[in-house]
């Protein structure tokens, strides 16, 4: 039978450390784009729903990722990423 190699490459960070670092990065970025009061309310909702659990940490990460993605996709004023809305100028050139 085939056996997996003994050396699986470099040791990875433990999942919980990586998850907490990701959460801190997302929180730091979210504070730059959303009101603190709104983010605090979101955090309270997650805490009331999940308590102090890893499931709550994963939920807030998922929500912050989705919010930031949509925010950038719509067009953040702090970023070049996103849809650039162009105004149409009516000059009559497109009419026949």
Curated annotation (Swiss-Prot):
GO (cellular component) term, any one: host cell
Gene3D superfamilies tied to this protein: 6.10.210.10, VpR/VpX protein, C-terminal domain
Pfam family of the protein (one): VPR
Chaperone among keywords: no
BP GO terms, sorted: DNA-templated transcription; monoatomic ion transmembrane transport; protein homooligomerization; regulation of DNA-templated transcription; symbiont entry into host cell; symbiont-mediated activation of host apoptosis; symbiont-mediated arrest of host cell cycle during G2/M transition; viral penetration into host nucleus
Annotated compartments: Virion; Host nucleus; Host extracellular space
Region listing for Homooligomerization, in residue ranges: 1-42
Description of post-translational modifications: Phosphorylated on several residues by host. These phosphorylations regulate VPR activity for the nuclear import of the HIV-1 pre-integration complex.
Principal subcellular localization: virion
Alphabetic keyword roster: Activator, AIDS, Apoptosis, Cell cycle, Host G2/M cell cycle arrest by virus, Host nucleus, Host-virus interaction, Ion channel, Ion transport, Modulation of host cell cycle by virus, Phosphoprotein, Transcription, Transcription regulation, Transport, Viral penetration into host nucleus, Virion, Virus entry into host cell
Residue(s) carrying Phosphoserine: 79, 96
Subunit architecture: Homooligomer, may form homodimer. Interacts with p6-gag region of the Pr55 Gag precursor protein through a (Leu-X-X)4 motif near the C-terminus of the P6gag protein. Interacts with host UNG. May interact with host RAD23A/HHR23A. Interacts with host VPRBP/DCAF1, leading to hijack the CUL4A-RBX1-DDB1-DCAF1/VPRBP complex, mediating ubiquitination of host proteins such as TERT and ZGPAT and arrest of the cell cycle in G2 phase.
Similarity annotation: Belongs to the HIV-1 VPR protein family.
Job description of the protein: During virus replication, may deplete host UNG protein, and incude G2-M cell cycle arrest. Acts by targeting specific host proteins for degradation by the 26S proteasome, through association with the cellular CUL4A-DDB1 E3 ligase complex by direct interaction with host VPRPB/DCAF-1. Cell cycle arrest reportedly occurs within hours of infection and is not blocked by antiviral agents, suggesting that it is initiated by the VPR carried into the virion. Additionally, VPR induces apoptosis in a cell cycle dependent manner suggesting that these two effects are mechanistically linked.
General remark: HIV-1 lineages are divided in three main groups, M (for Major), O (for Outlier), and N (for New, or Non-M, Non-O). The vast majority of strains found worldwide belong to the group M. Group O seems to be endemic to and largely confined to Cameroon and neighboring countries in West Central Africa, where these viruses represent a small minority of HIV-1 strains. The group N is represented by a limited number of isolates from Cameroonian persons. The group M is further subdivided in 9 clades or subtypes (A to D, F to H, J and K).
Name of the protein in question: Protein Vpr
Organism for this UniProt entry: Human immunodeficiency virus type 1 group M subtype F2 (isolate MP257)
């Amino acid at each position: 039978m085939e056996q997996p190699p003994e050396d699986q490459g470099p040791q990875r960070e433990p999942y919980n450390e990586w998850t907490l670092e990701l959460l801190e990065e997302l929180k730091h970025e979210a504070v730059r784009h959303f009101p603190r009061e709104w983010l605090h309310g979101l955090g309270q909702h997650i805490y009331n729903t999940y308590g102090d659990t890893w499931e709550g940490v994963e939920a807030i990460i998922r929500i912050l990722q989705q919010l930031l993605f949509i925010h950038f996709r719509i067009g953040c004023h702090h970023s070049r990423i996103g849809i650039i809305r162009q105004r149409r100028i009516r000059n009559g050139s497109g009419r026949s």
